[in-house]
C-alpha cells in the first residue's frame, strides 16, 4: 500500500446500481442504498442478508482492475466477514502468489498447498482430511495457499477438480485470482467482485476491465458484479467519483472501502477484522451483505434440479 493519505472519511458508502438493475428485490435495493456509520438498523440488515440460507454452494472470484488495487486484502476481509457472520464453512483459495499473497496475510497451520490438494483429492473423504490443506484464521475463514507456481503447474482440469472437492465441504469459496489465471477460474464464478484503487488510474482501469469481461463473454456476470473502490480518503474523492461514474449502471452495486493502515502488509498476518477501524469493518460488512444479496440468483448448475423439484410438486 502507498503511504496513508490524510483524513479518511468517517464512514463507508454504498452506491445504488443504475436504473436497469433496480428490478425486484426491494430489500436488496434498500440494502445497497443504505449508508453505514452508526446505523445499527442498516448493519442489522447486512447481517440478516449474510445469514439467509441458500441452495448449494457459491463461488466468488475477486479480481483487481489494476495492479495494487487491493484485490487480495478485499478478498481476505470479505472472507473473514462471511465466516464471522454467515455461520457456513468458508474457504479462500490463493491463486495470486507474491509478497502480498493471501496466505501470507493469515497465520499458517500447514505446509500443504492447492497443488497438493489437487494431487491427492481422491484421498479427501472428510472435513478432517480437508483441513490438512487449509489454515484457519480466528474468524473461521480457511485459506489454501497457492504453492510455488500454480500459474503454470495447474490446468483447467486441475481447477475443476479443486472446485468439485471444495464444494463437498464449503458453502462459500472465494478465489483470489492472478491475471494469468482469470480466464481459467471465471467459468466457475457465480459472482465477481471487482476491486479498483482510489486513484487517478481507477476510471480507466474499471472501463478496461468491463470491456474485457464483455469481450470474453462475461457480460451477464459483469452486470451482477459488485465494484469496490478501495482505500478511499477525502483527498481521493474526485478520482473515486470518476471511477464510480464509469461503473454506475454497468454493475449491480458500488462499495467504497475507506483507507485503513491496519490493512497494510506490514501488519500481516494480523489482518483480522477486529484490528480494523469501525468504519472499515462496517464497510466490509456492507460489502459482504451486498454480495450475499446476489446469492438469491440460482447458479446454472442447480437450475435443472430446481426445475425438476418444481415439476414434481
Describe the role of every protein-language-model region.
Residues 1-61:
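Extreme N-terminal, non-catalytic leader segments
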Residues 42-46, 56-97, 102-105, 119, ...:
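Walker A/P-loop phosphate-binding motif and the immediately C-terminal alpha-helix
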Residues 85-141:
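Phosphate-binding loop that captures ATP/GTP phosphates
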Residues 96-99, 148-151, 199-200, 232-236, ...:
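Conserved nucleotide-binding/hydrolysis micro-motifs of P-loop NTPases
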Residues 135-138, 142-184:
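Phosphate-binding/switch loop-helix module in NTP-utilizing enzymes
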Residues 162, 172-252:
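Conserved catalytic-core segment of NTP-binding enzymes
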Residues 231-278, 282:
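Beta-strand-loop-alpha "switch" segments that mediate conformational coupling across diverse proteins
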Residues 266-313:
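NTP-binding/hydrolysis catalytic cores, primarily Walker-type P-loop NTPases
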